[in-house]
């Protein structure tokens, strides 16, 4: 198992193709839905709860696909994409820990938006604090997270939940 503590864009894309942690590990989305350019740090003993943390980044430029359609003459990154990135990172964490199966977002306790990501921004930073992981018949990760744009916190989410399933046909 790869226990590196940082990952570049090529490695994240490899995760989306099942080539980073193995063909049965949870996968990240690829292409436009991959909302992460790099994982700066990942560990299993840091963070607010001492159970792990992830810091990841997305470079922002005015040419990103969502600025052309959300909204015409009022471009802003959809808040749901930042939230999805947080779920992506919880699923990645479970794969990094060795979980096998297909990752699925299961919910979130509370989400707050107090700002926006505009085309003139330079960088989005995601900071996740792992609260709990379960590795039994049920594999699940729970985390709290914030999103910063150019160093200013604009989103927060509590109790982000991602499960990993061997069979999603009846989910």
UniProtKB/Swiss-Prot annotation:
SUPFAM superfamilies: Thioesterase/thiol ester dehydrase-isomerase (SSF54637)
Gene designation per UniProt: fabA
Coiled coil spans: none
Biological process annotations from GO: unsaturated fatty acid biosynthetic process
GO CC term (a single one): cytoplasm
rRNA-binding found in the keyword field: no
Lineage: Bacteria, Pseudomonadati, Pseudomonadota, Gammaproteobacteria, Alteromonadales
Catalysed reaction equations from the record: a (3R)-hydroxyacyl-[ACP] = a (2E)-enoyl-[ACP] + H2O; (3R)-hydroxydecanoyl-[ACP] = (2E)-decenoyl-[ACP] + H2O; (2E)-decenoyl-[ACP] = (3Z)-decenoyl-[ACP]
Function description: Necessary for the introduction of cis unsaturation into fatty acids. Catalyzes the dehydration of (3R)-3-hydroxydecanoyl-ACP to E-(2)-decenoyl-ACP and then its isomerization to Z-(3)-decenoyl-ACP. Can catalyze the dehydratase reaction for beta-hydroxyacyl-ACPs with saturated chain lengths up to 16:0, being most active on intermediate chain length.
Protein name: 3-hydroxydecanoyl-[acyl-carrier-protein] dehydratase
Pfam families: FabA (PF07977)
Superkingdom of origin organism: Bacteria
Protein's pathway: Lipid metabolism; fatty acid biosynthesis
UniProt keyword Isomerase present: yes
Keywords: Cytoplasm, Fatty acid biosynthesis, Fatty acid metabolism, Isomerase, Lipid biosynthesis, Lipid metabolism, Lyase
Quaternary assembly: Homodimer.
Family: Belongs to the thioester dehydratase family. FabA subfamily.
Catalytic residues of the enzyme: 70
Subcellular location: Cytoplasm
EC numbers on record: 4.2.1.59, 5.3.3.14
